[in-house]
Amino acid sequence: MLRSFALVVGVTLAAGVAQAQAPQPPEIAARTYMLVDITANQILAAKDIDAPVEQASLTKLMTGYLVFDALRAKKIDLQQKLPVSVRAWKMPGSRMFIDPKMQVAVDDLIKGMIIQSGNDATMALAEGVGGTAENFVKLMNEQAKALGMTGTSYKNPEGLTEPGHLTTARDLSVLATRLMHDFPQYMHYYSTKQYSYPGTPPSNGNNRNSLLFRDPTVDGLKTGHTAAAGYCLVATAKREFPNVGTRRLLSIVLGTSSENARANESQKLLNWGYTAFDAVKLFDAGQAVATPAVWKGKENTVKMGRAEAIVIAVPAGSAGKVTTHISHQDPLVAPFTKGQAIGALKVSLGDESVRDVPLLALDGVEQAGVMGRAWDAMRLWIK
């Protein structure tokens, strides 16, 4: 059984927002697009986000994820030098301009893959981590499945056009979000504006993401282009707001007509998201949303909430129309561990449900002794 009670907050809501009340996004000239408020964990705008599309070099987001995972597991290190195979050297498309006579540090190869979008650097990393490109692709698909990217299939590590090498805007949002969350220590690569490996053409050094040069709040992530995919960009920005702090948005535009178009449409989406929606902090990180009674435990109550702040994206001017309902397991019987889901915060705008936030035990509660459990069992029976 769940016990619930209502709380009118005068602030809150977000966006999966009731369609009748959601702000209408600007006209976006892209095959498919998506705007996500990462801070509030809400979709603000979307078009055809489950349609299969060519990935182009957005593929390198997954390659990067696996390289960072290998670094975390200490299978490789940043200063380790990897060989450049003939296969890597002969990769077509964007290049870092490395060759088989070189041994290149992982740190430089990551820069070559992300900043220059080098297919040669990407192949060298894939072979270094996976042993072979084919084995690395297996790892890519296994990781996609683990992340819940149900519309994605990888055929290569760099993103060149190949039958069945497909993804969706929704899956890219999942990957980008997890990339930023799981590996914050490596996100500086995506905001670096220029890089050239010593002895290679300096004209090749500018980051393909032109928003980095236009908007100081943009700090990533990755461009892509092939004839089949069109011009694509997964971009992210963070801006500061009173009472909320840093608010991060993620835009995905796929299948635009030019480099300039992908930057313009991404900028349009980001600016619209920051102005059409307000961010409202409902609860601080670690703050008790409610303190329900505990049965058969060494403690009589437990605080439930979230380790991170609970923030909601609200259509501008709509905060006063929001209500929340808090529910929890009833009876709430020990034992349970810190971080275990024991309730939910339901947010509504008017009569329409907007978002459900799982509420976790902020502390664990051990089971009481025999006498304590027996006493509570009798009380529950009477109840």
Regions found by a protein language model. Name each.
Residues 4, 20-22, 307:
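Positively charged, low-complexity intrinsically disordered regions
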Residues 4-15:
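Bacterial N-terminal signal peptides
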Residues 16-22, 360:
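Bacterial Sec-dependent signal peptides at the C-terminal "C-region" and cleavage site
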Residues 20-184:
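Active-site-adjacent loops and short helices of periplasmic peptidoglycan-processing enzymes
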Residues 150-153, 161-166, 170-383:
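Domain-terminus/edge residues, biased toward the C-terminal soluble/receptor-binding domains
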